[in-house]
């Protein structure tokens, strides 16, 4: 029987996954990314590794995990171990700059953006953009470190307090005015849309994580909806081009044009809490079915 390992860091996000695997009778090894060691002379690897490493790990004191995972994925793929959300996908998870480049390569509209690695250069990078702007750590998640600046003068006054994150790079984007005050999140698994959520922020903050474990921090309201057809097509193309097996892709409908504008890609995508009530089914069951099919195919190869 093919062996499965799940590589992860957050202590709570993946309980539903492990419970669903157990219900399905699929055994797995749990690899904790913040306490990781692996032998370069190792010859017996799992047949399938499911990468569930998050870009927000550094904000929980686990920045060392992000760099070790990058090396582990390179080793696994070099040994021809099958990886769900492998090295190419992970590079997108930990770089918002690369996400913007992927959107552009895919022909998906994205906000005008720039990047910088110091407060002084951040101010310089913004001079070609139209305010207001959003400044985000390049490697981050769950809204950590995200700030809005309404003028260049405000940014100049507060640039020294901007969070650059674990790689010391910040992304700055023109703010996109939303047509309905909402953003939309398309969940994709194995080249197909699982569901789409309309996300309404309730109050301040930018933590739009939909999972149970984020409920105390995220004040967003999630409802199921149908994505714009052009947004769905673009999101699927982005996932294919980025070699991403599972992800959540977010867009806003620009009130000036009515067009979808893509601004975030979550390779580590948490399913919505209370999924049966919100989307009508348990996405973990479909995820485990997918993993089961991958394992079955690998068992036949063995």
Predicted features along the sequence, with ranges:
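Glycine-rich phosphate/pyrophosphate-binding beta-alpha loops
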Residues: 202, 266-280
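Extreme N-terminal starter segment of soluble prokaryotic enzymes
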Residues: 1-5
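Protein kinase-like catalytic core scaffold
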Residues: 133, 194-195, 247, 259-263
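A long amphipathic alpha-helix within ATP-dependent nucleotide-binding catalytic cores
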Residues: 207-260, 283-301
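Short glycine-rich anion-binding loops that position phosphate/pyrophosphate groups of nucleotides
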Residues: 54-57, 138-140, 268
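Conserved N-proximal alpha/beta basic substrate-recognition cap immediately N-terminal to
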Residues: 9-112
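Phosphate-binding site of ATP-dependent enzymes
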Residues: 144-241
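Rossmann-like NAD(P)H-binding beta-loop-alpha module
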Residues: 105-131
